[in-house]
Curated annotation (Swiss-Prot):
One of the record's GO molecular function terms: RNA binding
NCBIfam families reported for this sequence: Hfq, PRK00395.1
One Pfam family here: Hfq
Listed GO biological process terms: regulation of DNA-templated transcription; regulation of RNA stability; regulation of translation, ncRNA-mediated
Protein's UniProt name: RNA-binding protein Hfq
Keywords: RNA-binding, Stress response
Organism: Shewanella denitrificans (strain OS217 / ATCC BAA-1090 / DSM 15013)
CDD domains: Hfq
Keyword RNA-binding among UniProt keywords: yes
Residue ranges of domain Sm in the record: 9-68
Quaternary context: Homohexamer.
Protein family (similarity comment): Belongs to the Hfq family.
């Protein structure tokens, strides 16, 4: 798996598993809202009143409605880096 997906998959999987509402902004500025139903290497299936298949190359930003905490055990990918929310002292 590509190095760039070492954070992407655990993030999307946590959104899917916890059914967190998300706003997805496309590169053309359109805002989509719903819940991540499924995803693969190329698309995200977004469910609201209908299901939409959104190609990842068209996505600019994914904004969860609430904070997520992704633990290292949720990612078996090498190179996965967890950033703590606590400020450095």
């Amino acid at each position: 798996m590509a190095k760039g997906q070492s954070l992407q998959d655990p993030f999307l999987n946590a959104l899917r598993r916890e059914r967190v509402p998300v706003s997805i902004y496309l590169v053309n500025g359109i805002k989509l809202q719903g819940q991540v139903e499924s995803f693969d290497q190329f698309v995200i299936l977004l469910k609201n009143t209908v299901s939409q298949m959104v190609y990842k190359h068209a996505i600019s930003t994914v904004v969860p409605a609430r904070a997520l905490h992704i633990t290292p055990t949720q990612s078996s990918q090498p190179g996965y880096v967890q950033h703590d929310d606590a400020p450095a002292e």
